[in-house]
């Protein structure tokens, strides 16, 4: 059952091969058996089965939508009524939200059944899921490796077939990079496509929610439910609703050849994504994927994104600056961790934050406070915003000669747990290919396209596909065509 896609699972429900309750019980057993992966921070079988019973009733009454009865897990950055919502932090270890995030509410309204809340880097700050207050997550493909971050619990859960779908968030690559490391499909929509209401904020001008699943087709189904205008989110974009599945399985150009479904598609290859720093085994997997696209009729076009290397310093000025503001609300007064002993109000603030936040969060708060301080705001924050605009302009120049841009999602496969913990800069460099997409607010996704070599032969490689603004449906079409021609996305870790 766990090897089926969302569409196949829904067909099984419609054919009464199983009920939503039986499906939920199946996945709950798998989650319990895979506790060593540490992919979950909160599972509540009673809550899950109550939702499954409601889904069965809707299915029986003929009132169910296309996602009714299908299980999903939520990254623990989305507040969820009835469940703890921790953001991977001791600061919120026992926080119970009185409301659902818009993403959670929309998926619940579509009839999906929540299996649990997944582990993550604290406040979404990390690239390996080692920064969680609840311990690191293990990669199901190789349990000595990280699953990527910050949505590492979600990527591990989908990869290990503990859930057919998951939500994640992407601030600088936190859907695409863990999707790459865990061999699953994940999409970061255009900034503003998916509501941030109820998503615990890290960097408000960058944070964006999105789905993770086995395939592009499954992600398209999920995005249909997740996307849309939300008046409660000031950054939500008011656009007509779309069917993100509408191009799947169709030729790129009208009247196209079935043998060459992507004839007419121009794929931009940035020289900056294939230079020094890209591991040979990752390059080999990406090159093989590009050959598949050529066989499907696409044309490869050289493009340039000259400010790519500046995306790291720009991101690590802007994101910490916004984080220092967003996280100032966690002071032990209204909610969150409060120190047990303190002399006065100021001492309570200091001790509560010192005890509640982990090392990486403290590091970024300090950096953010510094770059926003008097005398440094112009030199750092404003300059970073200017370069951010230039990075976005570089993408628009590239899209004049191509329809999508492709390259690696990460310069390497997943590294060993603990390998980069003492060197935050090396950890930051792992996001070199994803940060600029986030800074520009563009949609991007990662699809499985192979594995590493030698000692890394069990560690997946992800192909990053970048689209222009609001072009998710076409981007998903391009990913789906690749997955119809290959089987990387249906391969499973040993023992699954």
UniProtKB/Swiss-Prot annotation:
Q: Name one GO molecular function term.
A: ATP binding
Report the superkingdom from the record: Bacteria
How would you classify this enzyme at the top EC level? ligase
Keywords for this protein: ATP-binding, Ligase, Nucleotide-binding, Protein biosynthesis
> Can you state which reaction this protein catalyses?
L-glutamyl-tRNA(Gln) + L-glutamine + ATP + H2O = L-glutaminyl-tRNA(Gln) + L-glutamate + ADP + phosphate + H(+)
GO cellular component terms, semicolon-separated: glutamyl-tRNA(Gln) amidotransferase complex
Catalytic residues (positions): 75, 150, 174
Listed EC numbers = 6.3.5.7
| SUPFAM superfamilies, sorted | Amidase signature (AS) enzymes (SSF75304)
Q: How does it assemble?
A: Heterotrimer of A, B and C subunits.
**Which PANTHER family does this chain map to?**
GLUTAMYL-TRNA(GLN) AMIDOTRANSFERASE SUBUNIT A, TRANSAMIDASE
NCBIfam families linked to this entry: gatA
Q: What does this protein do?
A: Allows the formation of correctly charged Gln-tRNA(Gln) through the transamidation of misacylated Glu-tRNA(Gln) in organisms which lack glutaminyl-tRNA synthetase. The reaction takes place in the presence of glutamine and ATP through an activated gamma-phospho-Glu-tRNA(Gln).
Family (UniProt): Belongs to the amidase family. GatA subfamily.
Instruction: Give the HAMAP family listed for this entry.
Output: GatA (MF_00120)
Q: What is this protein called?
A: Glutamyl-tRNA(Gln) amidotransferase subunit A
The species is Burkholderia mallei (strain ATCC 23344)
